[in-house]
Amino acid sequence: MKSSFASGAAALGFWLAAVAPLPAAAWQLTPEATAVERGMAAPNRLRRAINGGAFRAMAMVGHPVHEEITRQALQCPSEGPLAPGCEFDIRYQEAGVRWNDDPAFKFLPGRGKFPDCQSGTVRMVTQPLCWAQVFLSGERSARRGVQFTGANSNLLVRSHFGDLQFLHAMAVSDGETPEQTRRNVMAWLEFTWRTSIGEAKFDSQRMVARLPVDGFAERFRHNQGWRIQDLFSLGNPAVRTEEAIQRIALGSLLHVVQDSFAAGHVEREAPVSGVVCAGRTDWPAPGQILEFHSYPHQDSRKHGRADEPHGLEAHLAGARPHVIDVVRTVAELWRARTPWDDARPYLECVFTLSPTARVSSPGNSYRSDAPGDQVQWGG
């Protein structure tokens, strides 16, 4: 659940990674913007926010781990020849991978009364001080037991602390059954997949609350006017083409898949050699899921350490398939424009529950009252 904003200057990204870790999300997000986002950014404002320590209290922002996984999977490995389907321009997919951590939003009427918030669209790159204040306020409220939905909050807070935490492969609250979390995850994967392949009833002008996806009518009933385009491109007219929206939707799906391999989000068993998905030998099965964690009662810094580059390196050195293997398989299915009914068996396999799967909790290694354990990526 982390982020990374690649502004034009590498020094700015270094400053942010070194000085300003944010509260935890999943694989980390860096405060550097993609090329797609840079046109929206106010670089001087962002620099002042960083230099002023706006993000110092947060552990979720630091290194561009999500982006690195996406690049390795879609732009193909450094070893060996360039394989068919390897891409160079993945800017929209990267924007989508970042969207789950930093969805653009506008305040509900009567809300948004933070000192540094202005009218209009809020994102880390456009209103960084406002963004940090909203995030930290949401985190504090969630720890007090406030439940966030479309009735009382915005996308940023809902996705990190509220009813949309499944955007990071996490449970909405402690004690949620693994079956319920999995249903929420699979509903989002269905929506983003069908959008990403350009399915007829999932074009950018469709109303999100009316989509034929389990749970969407209830989840977005307070957002009746939202189109798919509004969800993924609020405040950014430059990406309002069908192709751009499709690739952003794919990136959002990849974020959920990637987060499911981050140990601060999901506890998995180790993969078992020879076990495959849906009887296909070219689909080796990842480790089964033992628990979806929930964030509000986690220690944000422990969560954040699990999302750093060393955590990814340890994960990639373990048993396969690892997260990059899985993302590559998903990308291959997407390039073939595989219909949802044919792609679903693989994604269901990626989120297979162990027979001993438990209800959600912060996770023993991530509780705010637990000793400082070494944390790492899941199996």
Positions of predicted regions on the chain:
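Catalytic glutamate of the conserved HExxH
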Residues: 252, 256, 260
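Active-site alpha-helix of zinc metalloproteases
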Residues: 247, 251
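N-terminal signal peptide c-region/cleavage motif recognized by signal peptidases
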Residues: 19-21
